[in-house]
Structures are given as structure tokens and as C-alpha cells.
Regions:
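Extended, charge-rich low-complexity interaction segments
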Residues: 353-371, 464-485
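Flexible, low-complexity junctional segments that flank or bridge functional domains
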Residues: 24-351, 407-409, 422, 436-461, ...
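Low-complexity, serine/threonine/proline-enriched polar segments
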Residues: 328-383
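Flexible, glycine-rich surface segments
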Residues: 370-432, 436, 446-447
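Bacterial N-terminal signal peptides that target proteins for export
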Residues: 1-8
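C-terminal segment of classical bacterial N-terminal signal peptides
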Residues: 14-22
């Protein structure tokens, strides 16, 4: 069976990222920043929304996807909305949030947008408190302690200006982030409910009702600039782990392996750290296989290349076990054969060759380039790379010994997406137990590149290929067998919770 690699966003978005960095480095240090220069923001939105639309038409595999007839109408409807908003856009906030809404309308974590000016952010306002999701409820999790006019910690939001809490979150957050049906999105962005960042397409609420200790009270909101420590406050609420790559061995014989990224960019520090981690795992292979438990920590891992999770599986379970317990085969991968996509993979291949990249990745890139070029020359929309069909009389793989003496736990949080999801798919098929929190999710559109929009102020993420016959469906998260409540950044508490899951 052919194994389809995902080289990942971090690898393949190089060309545009390098171009953007070069532009920033060429500018004099005291030159005005692009986002601060006066401009016609209405015309800029029209230009960039049209450019976004045209890039998608040219290169996104969904445009001609017979299994997704809603894609093209959604693309056109999003442009119509953005162009209508351009008629009344007067500032950078109107431009940015209209484009964010257009991108969010695709309901795809692999379609994204970012501002090219490094570290740019819009000034924010708040009413003196923030809410986050706790299950289905939005509760006050941070407030100015000196402001008696704000709801108490733990108070549950009921509604604002007559709009129910969940509908309000969909309007204020989901409209601009997308995939609001996912628990991970609400976990990651729920604190935006009571933040205002120069978004003219939503207003600032005037009054809200909260329930605390069985009593409901109405609060008038006093919006003002956020305090200087707002980012630290939000980081504390997010409970996101700041993990490093590494392999820890505990006194009870257990192991903890942390992989906060699968970035496969040949020039990245992450590549060196992943390479060193795999080498360390190979050195300790016998001890890992004899351990009472091994924790594969994926907290904070937003993806990269699926190559690394395959290597880790080989070290732990071995090739024979993986062959005897295969994932459901993907039928095929279809690449959108466009000039832009061919150029992106060609740039990636050049970088791989220049850095003596892994032969498997080089062969993968060469195959994709040659296939897309042939399809493009023949006037075909896609180049199809089909999986090898098993003969009807093919014998099943022979039984293989289970080399892992103890349990393998895969620890996930809401950040897990793309190649991180591929890792969860693979490791659970091999026998790992998922613990922690529900992951994010992706669609079957994969392998992004990041072209810059016409204004030069933003760049978008555009998938280049589509999976056919993937077992995990569109926007389907991985849900843990064992949910671990509490702070997902508390390593000691997580280890204690996992140890309690161990069989007696």
C-alpha cells in the first residue's frame, strides 16, 4: 500500500514567507510600517477580496471537486459579501475583518489569512472582564477586581442586548474564525466574546445578563482600552502548554515524549530537534518497549509533516506490527495542477536538495511535480496519485508480536490539527489510547501554500490537494477515550491523571 505523506504547512509555505521577510528586511528601520500608511481601505478590500477569490479559482482543489458542489457557490457568495462591505469600509479594521470573514466562510482550518507586517495587532477594548467556555457555558474567568460594576468570577453569560449567549458568540467570533461547531475553536477563541479590535462589522454590546449563585443580574458594559497585561491574562486563561521537544524517563519506568510540532522545513530548528528526538528514541528503544507506559505528548502541535509520526511509530511498535495493523487506506490524492502549486512544490524540492533533505521527501516532491506538470500540459484539472490496489487473493499480513509491554497514551489538546491529527490516526490504529481533550479538525483539502494578496498587506493559506476516501471525515475531530479535566498546561497533574489510568 502506498503511504501518502503530508509535508505540511510549515514546509511548503516557504517561498511566499521568504519573499515577505525579504521585503521587510529591505525596508529602512525608520520607514513607516505598511499598515500605518494612509490608503484607500475600501479599494484595498476590493482588490484583496478579488485577489483572494482569483487565487482560489486558480489553485484550490475544491473549485472543481465533484464531491463538494457547495464549494464554488460559497466562494462566490463570500466575494459578494466582501465587496458589499468594501462600499462602507473606511479603515484597516474594516479591511481586515471583512477578509477574515471571507476566509472563515470556507469552514476549513487549512484556509487561513495573516498580516504580513510582523507583530502587527489592532488596539483592543474590553468592558473590564473576559469569559471563556466551560463546557457549553460561557463564564467570567478574568475581571478587574476593583471594578464592582463587572460580573463576578464564575458568573454564566445568559444574553446581551437580547441576543442569547451562543448566538452572540457565533456572530462575534464564529463569523470571523469559522468552524464554530468545533469544541477546539470555542476553547481557542472563546475569550473574544468581550474583546473589541476595531471590527466595524459587529458592535460593542450595551448590557448583558449573567447568572451567579442562582440569581440573574443585568450589567451595563463600560468599554475601554484593555490593560497592558491583557496578553498575559489571556495566556493564563488559555491554559496552553509551552512544551519543548524531549524524552523524559520517570522513576516508575514510564516515559514522556514531547513533540510540540512536526515542522519539516529543512532549514528550521524544529527539524534538528525532531531528528535528535528520533535518534534518542532509537537509542532507548528497548527501554521504551519494556516501559509500563509511554506518553506521546502532542499538546500545542498544530501539524507539519506526517513523516515524523510514522518514524516514531516504527521505533515503538515496529514495522511488522504497523503492517499488521494498517490504517484504512486512502483511495487516492488529487493535486490541483496549477502553475502556482507546481512552483510551490518546486521551491520546496530545491530547498530539500540544497540541504541534503530526506530521500523519501525528495522522491515525494519529484513525484508531485512531474505528475502536476503532466496533468497541466494535458489540460487536466487534477493529477491523481492512486493507492495501490491489493489483489483480490492477496494474503493478509502475518501476525506480528506486540513489542510494547505497557500502554501508550497520546495526549492531545485543542491545538492538534493537520499532521498532528494524522499522528493520532496512526498511533490509535497501532493501539495507543487518546487522553486529554478533543482535538481540532481538518477537511480533506491539504498541503498549503501561502500567496500574498495584491496589496502586499496579507497572505492567505490555500490547500493544493484533496484526499479521496480518507476514513476520518471533513472537520471530524479526534475525541479522547479518557477526558482529563483541569489545566492542560499542568504537567504534574496530567502525569498523575495518566498514572491513575494504569491497570492495577
Amino acid at each position: 500500500m502506498k503511504r501518502f505523506l503530508t509535508a505540511g504547512a510549515a514546509c511548503l509555505a516557504m517561498a511566499s514567507a521568504v519573499h515577505t521577510q525579504a521585503l521587510a528586511q529591505d525596508a529602512p528601520a525608520d520607514a513607516p510600517k505598511p499598515m500605518d500608511l494612509p490608503r484607500d481601505w475600501s479599494a484595498t478590500l476590493t482588490q484583496d477580496a478579488t485577489g483572494l477569490h482569483d487565487i482560489m479559482i486558480d489553485s484550490h482543489p475544491g473549485v472543481h471537486d465533484p464531491l463538494n458542489p457547495a464549494f464554488k457557490p460559497r466562494l462566490e457568495e463570500g466575494l459578494t459579501v466582501a465587496l458589499e462591505r468594501a462600499k462602507t469600509t473606511t479603515d484597516a479594521g474594516g479591511w481586515w475583518w471583512a477578509l477574515r470573514a471571507y476566509v472563515a466562510s470556507f469552514e476549513d482550518g487549512h484556509v487561513g489569512i495573516s498580516i504580513t507586517q510582523p507583530n502587527y495587532g489592532f488596539p483592543t477594548r474590553w468592558p473590564g472582564f473576559l469569559t471563556v467556555y466551560r463546557g457549553a457555558d460561557q463564564v467570567v474567568a478574568d475581571r478587574e477586581p476593583a471594578d464592582a460594576a463587572t460580573p463576578p468570577l464564575g458568573a454564566r453569560l445568559i444574553d446581551c442586548d437580547g441576543v442569547a449567549a451562543e448566538a452572540l458568540a457565533e456572530q462575534r467570533i464564529g463569523q470571523f474564525r469559522g468552524r464554530w461547531f468545533l469544541e477546539a475553536q470555542r476553547t481557542l477563541y472563546g475569550d473574544w466574546q468581550f474583546l473589541s479590535a476595531q471590527n466595524p462589522w459587529i458592535g460593542e454590546m450595551r448590557q448583558c445578563r449573567f447568572e451567579a449563585d442562582g440569581a440573574t443580574k443585568t450589567y451595563a458594559l463600560n468599554w475601554r482600552a484593555t490593560p497592558e497585561d491583557i496578553y498575559a491574562r489571556r495566556a493564563k486563561l488559555a491554559q496552553r502548554a509551552a512544551t519543548d521537544f524531549g524524552l523524559k524517563h520517570f522513576d516508575d519506568g514510564g516515559f514522556w515524549i514531547s513533540t510540540p510540532s512536526f515542522n519539516g522545513d529543512p532549514s528550521s530548528e524544529t527539524l534538528a530537534e525532531l531528528t535528535a528526538l528520533i535518534a534518542d528514541m532509537k537509542t532507548k528503544q528497548d527501554a521504551l518497549r519494556a516501559a509500563p507506559y509511554v506518553v506521546l505528548d502532542l499538546r500545542g502541535n498544530g501539524g507539519g509533516s506526517s513523516h515524523w509520526s510514522q518514524l516514531m511509530a516504527q521505533v515503538l511498535w515496529g514495522d511488522a506490527w504497523m503492517a499488521a495493523h494498517p490504517e484504512p487506506a486512502i483511495e487516492a490524492v488529487e493535486w490541483r495542477a496549477s502553475d502556482g502549486n507546481i512552483a510551490e512544490i518546486s521551491a520546496f524540492l530545491d530547498k530539500l536538495r540544497a540541504t541534503n533533505g530526506q530521500p523519501e521527501l525528495i522522491a515525494w516532491a519529484e513525484d508531485a511535480i512531474n505528475g502536476m506538470k503532466a496533468a497541466h500540459a494535458a489540460g487536466q484539472v487534477y493529477w491523481r496519485s492512486a493507492n495501490d490496489e491489493k489483489p483480490a487473493d492477496a494474503a493478509p499480513p502475518p501476525p506480528a508480536p506486540q513489542l510494547m509491554a505497557g500502554r501508550v497514551y497520546v495526549l492531545t489538546d485543542s491545538s492538534c490539527g493537520s499532521a498532528c491529527l494524522d499522528a493520532v490516526d496512526l498511533w490509535k490504529t497501532a493501539g495507543a489510547l487518546q487522553v486529554g481533550r478533543e482535538t481540532s479538525a481538518d477537511t480533506v483539502y491539504m498541503e498549503i501554500r501561502e500567496p500574498v494578496l495584491p496589496s502586499g498587506l496579507a497572505q492567505i493559506a490555500v490547500p493544493m490537494k484533496v484526499y479521496r476516501g480518507r476514513a476520518r471525515g471533513n472537520n471530524e475531530p479526534q475525541r479522547p477515550q479518557y477526558i482529563i479535566a483541569g489545566d492542560m498546561s499542568d504537567d504534574a497533574a496530567l502525569l498523575a491523571a495518566i498514572r491513575r489510568l494504569q491497570p492495577d
